[in-house]
């Protein structure tokens, strides 16, 4: 009886964790999964250094946290509402575009205004990132093994949180300014978004038709 309540994914199948990990779409999703955890952690990890090079007080940087939290919560609610009406494939491909703009602002912007805009934009991605990927795994790989598939996705994000601070710290030690690195992060998010767009567009053709 329990199996009858599960939704199927691509090709009308209930994908196992191993099957999902051997499918190309999972690896298309990996760069997008790594990005927010890697570079969001890096942003917080290097906050003192960032404040110094931007010539703002550390207290001003920390004062952005309530704004970031509020925008993240609002984005979670709005993305969930939009998800029910528009669907995962149409939404998820745009999820990381605010992060592109956010890290451009972090890299090129100055003063408190740049911080406000950057944290607000990154909050949009952070909130949507808490909602849309969960629906993505269920819609494209089915729900029978959703727990183990999401666990692997979570492991990728944990890996990202370890990579980000180390990578950016190495860049600072190598003489690459944090501002230049954040512009490169914006390019990374752009490439991850483009890859995700192409992958989701192709994989959407494999989904079973929606029930009326």
Model-derived segments and their meaning:
Residues 90-104:
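Structural signature of the two symmetry-related core transmembrane helices
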Residues 140-175:
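A late C-terminal transmembrane helix in Major Facilitator Superfamily
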Residues 75-87, 172-173:
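Helix-to-loop junctions at the C-terminal end of transmembrane segments
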Residues 170-188:
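A membrane-interface helix-boundary motif in multi-pass transporters
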């Amino acid at each position: 009886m329990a199996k009858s309540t599960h939704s199927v994914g691509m090709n009308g199948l209930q994908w196992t964790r191993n099957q999902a990990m051997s499918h190309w779409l999972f690896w298309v999703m990996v760069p997008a999964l790594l990005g927010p955890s890697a570079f969001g952690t890096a942003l917080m990890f290097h906050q003192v250094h960032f404040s110094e090079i931007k010539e703002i007080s550390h207290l001003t940087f920390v004062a952005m946290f309530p704004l970031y939290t509020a925008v993240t919560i609002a984005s979670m609610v709005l993305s969930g509402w939009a998800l029910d009406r528009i669907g995962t494939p149409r939404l998820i491909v745009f999820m990381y575009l605010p992060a592109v703009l956010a890290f451009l602002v972090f890299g090129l912007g100055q003063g408190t205004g740049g911080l406000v805009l950057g944290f607000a934009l990154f909050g949009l991605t952070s909130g949507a990132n808490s909602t849309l990927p969960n629906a993505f795994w269920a819609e494209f790989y089915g729900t029978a093994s959703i727990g183990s598939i999401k666990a692997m996705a979570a492991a990728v994000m944990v890996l990202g949180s370890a990579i980000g601070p180390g990578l950016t710290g190495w860049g600072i030690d190598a003489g690459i300014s944090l501002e230049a690195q954040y512009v490169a992060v914006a390019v990374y998010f752009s490439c991850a978004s483009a890859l995700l767009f192409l992958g989701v567009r192709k994989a959407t053709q494999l989904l079973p038709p929606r029930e009326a």
